[in-house]
Amino acid sequence: MSFNVSATADASNTAGMAKQYAYEMDKAMKEWSNDAEFALMRSTVISTSGSALRSMTSLKASITTNATSQSGVSLSENTLNDYLGTAWDQGGNPDEVYVGKTLKRRISGFTAGNTKFVDSTDKRLVNAVDVYESDFGIIKLFKHRYITQSGDNNLDIVGIQSDKFRVATLRSPQHVSLAKTGDATKGMIVGELTLEFLAENSSFKGTAHL
């Protein structure tokens, strides 16, 4: 994630910021984090070659054992419990479910126990998070913008046993100065991470829902 700022822009008195370069660096760091989140959820593994950078296997791509294509079937409460049961039969115990906005609203309409709470030890839970009481235990429901995106032809759902997945960081994101050319200062944000999945059959994935 690279950026550059002209000397004129950096020297100017810009409202709302002390220095243009610092602002662009902060913005690039946020974009890097956003790209990393996208890759963790949706990327497909690619080996390094002359024309392609290496990439990791994402959360969606890593779940293969308990992966079901529903071919246009609407997500129901029974279907969700079937997903959880399939993972349970494989020795898993999913405790988190990730969906886009449409399936999140559908699950919120289920008749089973559905409440809200805040767990102060879980730093992801800034606001109250929905909790679904399933036949296989209590599940945290997370609305995630990259599960389903504009342009996708289906709606997907992913449920994981959270202690079987983790982000492994090789290099934390950091600012690196680039060689100056002309009347501009250049920099980039660089970092390396990957997704570790210890037992993907502990989790489930349902695709192609209406």
Regions found by a protein language model. Name each.
Residues M1-L210:
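Flexible, glycine/threonine- and acidic-rich loop/arm segments that mediate assembly and lattice contacts
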